[in-house]
């Protein structure tokens, strides 16, 4: 530790760039998606993780999510939130990245897992939206028409008589 004035400066934490958690991120050739993911994971750049978190792979996953959603639901969706996608990719990477030296096979495995997990969240949302749109476009037919019919004027009170009802008259002998 180093003392500057009355302040103690912790030298273990990088003071020149407090967002640099680990790894060699001074290399300007790293893509922002790779840098963000590696900072989350506290890993140094390596061929497999830089390829997995590359812009090309993120775009591939986005396109695959759009096409698979179209195939399963016939709905067109837009690209998903990239920050959430990177977090999902990082979670899958931490759980299932058993890299055996074959980058293509490892990428194929992890991409399949990421796409499957994302679709588990996307498809129910799209189906719920489709049901909402369908129900919102139909007239109300929930069987509660009698309960929700338009109100009647209060001046009509007492003018309706139930059939089969005989009022009792106490004054009658």
From Swiss-Prot:
Protein induction: Expressed in the late phase of the viral replicative cycle.
Source domain of life: Viruses
Keyword Transport annotated: no
Function: One of the minor capsid proteins that constitute a network internal to the major capsid proteins and outside the lipid membrane. The minor capsid proteins glue and stabilize the capsomers.
Protein name: Minor capsid protein P8
Keyword Signal: no
Assigned keywords, A-Z: Capsid protein, Late protein, Virion
GO cellular component: viral capsid
Organism from which the protein derives: Paramecium bursaria Chlorella virus 1
Pfam families on file: P8_CR
Oligomeric form and interacting partners: Interacts with the major capsid protein.
Compartment(s) where it occurs, according to its Swiss-Prot or TrEMBL record: Virion
Main location, first listed in the record: virion
């Amino acid at each position: 530790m180093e003392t500057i004035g009355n302040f103690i400066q912790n030298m273990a934490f990088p003071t020149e760039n407090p967002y640099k958690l680990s790894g060699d991120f001074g290399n300007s050739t790293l893509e922002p998606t790779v840098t963000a993911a590696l900072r989350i994971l506290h890993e140094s750049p390596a061929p497999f993780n830089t390829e997995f978190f590359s812009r090309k792979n993120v775009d591939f996953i986005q396109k695959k999510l759009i096409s698979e959603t179209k195939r399963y639901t016939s709905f067109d969706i837009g690209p998903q939130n990239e920050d959430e996608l990177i977090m999902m990719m990082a979670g899958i990477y931490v759980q299932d990245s058993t890299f055996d030296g074959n980058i293509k096979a490892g990428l194929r495995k992890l991409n399949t897992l990421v796409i499957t997990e994302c679709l588990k969240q996307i498809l129910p949302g799209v189906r719920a939206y489709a049901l909402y749109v369908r129900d919102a476009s139909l007239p109300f037919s929930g069987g509660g028409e009698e309960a929700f019919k338009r109100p009647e004027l209060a001046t009509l009170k007492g003018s309706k008589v139930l059939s089969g009802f005989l009022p009792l008259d106490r004054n009658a002998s």
